[in-house]
Every structure is written in C-alpha cells, then in structure tokens.
Swiss-Prot record:
Family label: Belongs to the NusB family.
Gene Ontology BP terms: DNA-templated transcription termination; transcription antitermination
Organism superkingdom: Bacteria
Record's keyword terms, sorted: RNA-binding, Transcription, Transcription antitermination, Transcription regulation
InterPro entries to which the protein is assigned, alphabetical: NusB-like_sf, NusB_fam, NusB_RsmB_TIM44
Function: Involved in transcription antitermination. Required for transcription of ribosomal RNA (rRNA) genes. Binds specifically to the boxA antiterminator sequence of the ribosomal RNA (rrn) operons.
NCBIfam families: nusB, PRK00202.1-1
Gene that encodes it: nusB
Any Pfam family matching the protein: NusB
GO molecular function, one term: RNA binding
Full protein name: Transcription antitermination protein NusB
Length: 144
C-alpha cells in the first residue's frame, strides 16, 4: 500500500486532527497517534513506526491545554451556543487550530488558520469551515 500522506506539515496536522477526534471518542493517546499516522503506511514487521514529533507535539499540546482551549473557545461563541453544542469535528479543529495559533510561535497565525480551514473543508462542510475560520480569526485579531 502506498501512503497518500507525504509527512508535510499539512499532512501531520490532518493526522493530529484524526488523533484528537479519536481521543474524543475514547481512544488512548499513543494508540490513536500511531493509528492516525500509520494506518496507510507500509512498514515491515521488524521496523517500528515512529510518529513525527510535530504530530506528537500538536496532539500532546492540545490534550495538555484542553481546558484552557475550551474556555477560550466558549468565550467566543455567540449567545445561546455552548461548546457541548458543537460537533466533535468542529471542537477538534478549533482546539487544534487555537493551540497552534497560541503556542507555536514558529507557525504564522494565518498559516495555522489556513491549514485548519483546509482540513475542515475535507472533514466537514463549507458552513463548518466558515464557522472555524470566523472563530479562529477572532483570536488572531484580538491577539494582535
């Protein structure tokens, strides 16, 4: 089987999203990361698949800061909306995007935003992508 992922940062962000989504449905951290990274890779039995540090840093960071990220996201939702009302896809995307914007200084905010929007378009619909864009754009605007 040939991998469709080339381990670009975009691909690793997508794998991080998949891992975070899996964790929301009850998966274990390292198992979820290994599965998300390696499910379409061909690896010989004698070789251990090493999950890239960028992917692990994203997932671990979101997990470690989940309560803070959720509080920030909740504070920017419109009246009548709560975090519980959001889909798991949107919550996972918002947490991942906000974590990278807030904590990854080496990634420009607009790059992190654009990457999350592209993942949103792939795993959700246009309305969701616009929602994620709008909410994360507020953080970028308020931060500067």
């Amino acid at each position: 089987m040939t991998s469709v992922f080339k381990d670009s940062r975009r691909d690793l962000r997508e794998r991080a999203f998949q891992t975070l989504f899996s964790l929301e449905t009850g998966g274990e951290f390292i198992d979820a990361a290994h599965f998300a990274y390696g499910y379409d890779k061909t690896v010989s039995e004698d070789k251990v698949l090493e999950v890239p540090i960028f992917l692990l840093n994203l997932v671990n960071g979101v997990v470690d800061h989940k309560d803070e990220l959720d509080t920030l996201i909740s504070s920017h939702l419109k009246s009548g909306w709560s975090l519980e009302r959001l889909t798991l896809v949107d919550k996972s995307l918002l947490r991942l995007g906000l974590y990278e914007i807030k904590y990854f200084d080496e990634t420009p905010d607009r790059v992190a935003l654009n990457e999350i929007i592209e993942i949103a378009k792939k795993y959700s619909d246009e309305t969701s992508a616009k929602f994620v864009n709008g909410l994360l754009s507020q953080f970028i605007t308020n931060e500067n």
